Structure formats: C-alpha cells, structure tokens
Amino acid sequence: MNAVAEAPVTEDVPAPFVFTDSAADKVKQLIEEEGNAELKLRVFVQGGGCSGFQYGFTFDEEVNEDDTTMVKNGVTLLIDSMSYQYLVGAEIDYKEDINGAQFVIKNPNASTTCGCGSSFSV
C-alpha cells in the first residue's frame, strides 16, 4: 500500500506591519499628484528627536535588497532592515482631525513617545 504524504498545514502568518487603508489611500493621492507611478513610500527610523529615535517618511523609486515590502491598495510600502526591527508590529495610519492631518505610527515596540508622536525610545 502506498502512503500519500500530505502537505503540511500552515497557518496564516500575520503581516509584520499594518498599513491602513487611510494611509494607503493618502499615499496613492500624493503619488498621483507627483505624477510618477514608480514612487513607493519608504518609512524609516533614524536617531534623533527628543526621545532618541524618530520616524521618517520619503518617496523612493528603488527597492533595496534588504527592504521589506508591503502592497496595499496599489501602493508599495518599503522598510529597510535596520528600521524593521523597530517597526515590526507597528501600524502606519493617516489621520485627519481638528489639529491637522498627518501620518501616524502606533508602535508597540516604543517604551516612551514624545508629545508630538514623531520620536520614541525602546
């Protein structure tokens, strides 16, 4: 009798980041305004700010070898390997309220965050 090997059962692995519809839609709008469909949103962490690290956002046409990518609503999010360790599990969102409009990162790895929300410590 021949035994048939079954494929291993795999569970859905959660994405390393949450890139909200609101953020993706705003990035899509900004890319359309720039007139360059090759642009991708790069989110990164660098030293600075009042808490030690700060978030940065920029458009980039290039995907580097060590980048983690996520596509949402036709928009590509890029995170480099150094920033990845600080951002894994984070939510990248876009909020509009009476105080203005801005991209917001909710980061479970941050032990403290400054009042403006643009810098953090781990």
From Swiss-Prot:
Belongs to the HesB/IscA family. Required for insertion of 4Fe-4S clusters. Keywords: Iron, Iron-sulfur, Metal-binding. This is Putative iron-sulfur cluster insertion protein ErpA. The gene is erpA. The keyword Iron applies. Homodimer. It comes from the Bacteria. One of its GO terms (molecular function) is 2 iron, 2 sulfur cluster binding. InterPro entries: FeS_biogenesis, FeS_cluster_insertion, FeS_cluster_insertion_CS, FeS_cluster_insertion_RrpA, HesB-like_dom_sf. Its cofactor is iron-sulfur cluster. It comes from Cupriavidus necator (strain ATCC 17699 / DSM 428 / KCTC 22496 / NCIMB 10442 / H16 / Stanier 337) (Ralstonia eutropha). Iron-sulfur cluster binds at C50, C114, C116. GO terms for biological process: iron-sulfur cluster assembly. The lineage of its organism: Bacteria, Pseudomonadati, Pseudomonadota, Betaproteobacteria, Burkholderiales. Binds 1 iron-sulfur cluster per subunit.
